[in-house]
Amino acid sequence: MALSLIGSKMATLSGLRSIMEDIAVSTASGPSDWLNLGIGNPASIPEAIAEWRSLTEEALAEDFASASCQYGPSRGSAALVEAITGYFNERYGWSLTPRNVAVGPGSQMLCFTAAALFAGPGRHPGSTATGGTKVILPMAPDYTGYQGLCLHPDGVVGIPAAPVPEGTHRFRYAFGFPALEQRQDIGMLLLSSPGNPTGRAVDASELDALVGLARRRDVPLLLDHAYGEPFPRIAPTLTPPPLDEHVINCFTLSKAGLPGERIAFAIGAERWITPMVSFLANSALHAPQLQQSVVARALTSGRLDRLITQTVVPFYQEHRRLAEKLFEEVLPESVPWRLHSGDGGMFCWFWIDDDRFDDTALYERLKRDRVFIVPGRHFFPDTPANPHRTHCFRVSLSPTTETLTEGIARIANALRP
């Protein structure tokens, strides 16, 4: 079978996807005693499951015929778009209209849509016949799923962040703004904030610098708020979502407890949102309508805010505190380990400051102990010469406290010289 150039690109299994496949195959066979600290799934919180089930049952009873038994608008259902504009206008004092909103089947699809529209070969001043403009990640590491967004080869470029030590066992990344400013091929800037895998949120001065660059280059800055304000608030944010002519804000319900239903939405200026709606119409027609009804109910009733405040935020705060306490207690003092500073998030991101350390070697060692983590290199696109990428790994905070406790003990044992 012959694949097109685009087909060859999109049919390739990314590094992290191969890890996820390895986890799925390993855990599906043999005893069920694996400790999976590599998962990207949000936690299955019973109270969150019950709340979404209740909202879904209400939508089924009242909206099934109108939502599931006929097509709908590609921008999103009128009820959800109205709920979104009302929620954000009231919360942040914005003046959104439906023309500022695009609802899509998951934030991954919205990011893919924006990448296809605003980066790549074309008529943009930064485009060239050989390569076109790029999707630029201003801070690498960042969400590994971004690396599969572009239909053309080498379409995603990461700007390596500088790890800055803090105290004995902490560090924090700093933006490489000089290297970012030197890029003449920016088609779109893309950043998760708070970030995956680090939980790091941009501060006001950093955000001003990124928005200023987007304005000067006349390109969009897409901010992925999957972990931040106003939901799910798993990791604390330092600034509210910015409303700016050159910013596309992307929000999802996945980390609020609804990952399987693939509902997300983008908010931005009409110049960006209108082509995104057209792209969605041509590619997916529209997002699932019954779940749009569910989310509209959650927003307008205030039940989503209560779920986040009373259930989701406390869960991850507790797991973060437990993980930090355990790592401090059991990780060997002889190992130069550092945890990315933060007060929340779905993950712990580690840097082993030792040139002899290799992330995939740790992965294989822990796999023999029936523990899964994620090697750090998969979060660094297009930076093979950066040795830091092989000195990191990610641990999920979504598992049960029992799994976390035993898994962290085995990680400590694997790190001992």
List each model region and its residues.
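Conserved glycine-rich beta-strand-loop-beta hairpin in the small C-terminal domain of fold type I
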Residues: 36, 310-324, 336-352
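Generic structural signal for small/hydrophobic residues in well-ordered secondary structure
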Residues: 19, 37, 84, 101, ...
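Conserved core of the PLP fold type I
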Residues: 65-217, 222, 228-244, 248, ...
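PLP-dependent enzyme catalytic core of the Aspartate aminotransferase-like
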Residues: 82, 86, 90, 95, ...
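Short, conserved charged micro-motifs
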Residues: 356-362, 402-406
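N-terminal "arm"/small-domain region of PLP-dependent enzymes with the aminotransferase-like
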Residues: 1-75, 86-90, 185, 217-219, ...
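Conserved core segment of the aminotransferase class I/II
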Residues: 127-132, 151, 243-317, 329-330
